Amino acid sequence: MYNVIFVLGGPGAGKGTQCDRLAEKFDKFVHISAGDCLREEQNRPGSKYGNLIKEYIKDGKIVPMEITISLLETKMKECHDKGIDKFLIDGFPREMDQCEGFEKSVCPAKFALYFRCGQETMLKRLIHRGKTSGRSDDNIESIKKRFVTYTKASMPVVEYLKSQNRLITIDAEQDPDAVFEDTVKALQPYL
């Protein structure tokens, strides 16, 4: 029913930037950001999860998977109703139970793009982004917590998908244009 590509990488690795560019170049793909879904729900008037999501994001913690999967699936259904079935899901799964839960209850991902980037580069990008993003989690304290969470919880997902030969690794240390060029080349066999 759905064709899903997970898009993984640490905070500030460039996942959102690259997904936006890919969705623009290949109009058959829709970019769904797990973080954006959570922030939208957090700010939606009357949301029963808003305050909970806000606390998790502020503390750099991973929001319970049932909430995130439900929000992602709702977005996917909305797109599917418009005839779109190819998705770049950015920033998800963040831990193994999310990966297993999504693949069991929604659909298996075809593969994952992993934007590999060092913490020093990601930190510089996030500090720069924090000046204009208005995101509550683009501050040094939250960023450091997000790095710890990412390393402990998300790297096992990367290793798991790699062990299943469902991982394409992209060097995200480069400038965004070079990263995009490498990503498009890596995706060619799947388009």
Swiss-Prot record:
It is an enzyme of class 2 (transferase). Binds 1 Mg(2+) ion per monomer. Residues 128-138 are annotated as: LID. CDD domains: ADK. Its EC number is 2.7.4.14. Its main location: cytoplasm. Its cofactor is Mg(2+). The keyword Nucleus applies. The keyword Chaperone does not apply. Gene3D superfamilies: P-loop containing nucleotide triphosphate hydrolases. Keywords: ATP-binding, Cytoplasm, Kinase, Nucleotide-binding, Nucleus, Pyrimidine biosynthesis, Transferase. Residues 33-63 are annotated as: NMP. GO terms for cellular component: cytoplasm; cytosol; nucleus. It catalyses: UMP + ATP = UDP + ADP. PROSITE patterns: ADENYLATE_KINASE (PS00113). It holds the Pfam family ADK. A ribonucleoside 5'-phosphate binds at residues 39, 61-63, 91-94, 98, 135, 146. It is found in: Cytoplasm; Nucleus. InterPro entries: Adenylat/UMP-CMP_kin, Adenylat_kinase_CS, P-loop_NTPase, UMP_CMP_kinase. Catalyzes the phosphorylation of pyrimidine nucleoside monophosphates at the expense of ATP. Plays an important role in de novo pyrimidine nucleotide biosynthesis. Has preference for UMP and dUMP as phosphate acceptors, but can also use CMP, dCMP and AMP. Consists of three domains, a large central CORE domain and two small peripheral domains, NMPbind and LID, which undergo movements during catalysis. The LID domain closes over the site of phosphoryl transfer upon ATP binding. Assembling and dissambling the active center during each catalytic cycle provides an effective means to prevent ATP hydrolysis. PANTHER family: NUCLEOTIDE KINASE. Belongs to the adenylate kinase family. UMP-CMP kinase subfamily. This is Uridylate kinase. It comes from Schizosaccharomyces pombe (strain 972 / ATCC 24843).
